[in-house]
Amino acid sequence: MSSAATKPVKRSGIIKGFNKGHAVAKRTVTSTFKKQVVTKRVAAIRDVIREISGFSPYERRVSELLKSGLDKRALKVAKKRLGSIQAGKKKRDDIANINRKASAK
C-alpha cells in the first residue's frame, strides 16, 4: 500500500495520477458552539425560572447540608443525583454561592 493512498494529498487539477481531481482549498471548520459560555439573556432567564420554580428536593437537601458544614456529604448527594463528580462539584459550588448571597442580604 502506498503512502499516497493512506494520507490525503493536495489535488493537482490533472485528470490522471495520484493527485488527480479538482484543486480546491481546504476549509477549516470553526466551532460556533461554546459549552460553558452563558450570555446575559440566558442568565436572566435562568434567574426568573429559579425564582418561580424554586429548588428541587435534592437541591434543598444539599443546601441544608452545606449550611450545617457537611460539604463532603453534600457532594455525595449531588453526585448521586446528577451522575458525575464534576457535575456534583459544580452544583455544590452553585448552591454554596446561592447560600452565601442569601446570608449576605
UniProtKB/Swiss-Prot annotation:
Transmembrane segments: none annotated. InterPro entries: Ribosomal_eL36, Ribosomal_eL36_sf. GO terms for biological process: cytoplasmic translation; translation. It holds the Pfam family Ribosomal_L36e. Residues 86-105 are annotated as: Disordered. It comes from the Eukaryota. Keywords: Ribonucleoprotein, Ribosomal protein. One of its GO terms (molecular function) is structural constituent of ribosome. One of its GO terms (cellular component) is cytosolic large ribosomal subunit. The keyword Ribonucleoprotein applies. Belongs to the eukaryotic ribosomal protein eL36 family. This is Large ribosomal subunit protein eL36. It comes from Dictyostelium discoideum. The lineage of its organism: Eukaryota, Amoebozoa, Evosea, Eumycetozoa, Dictyostelia. The gene is rpl36.
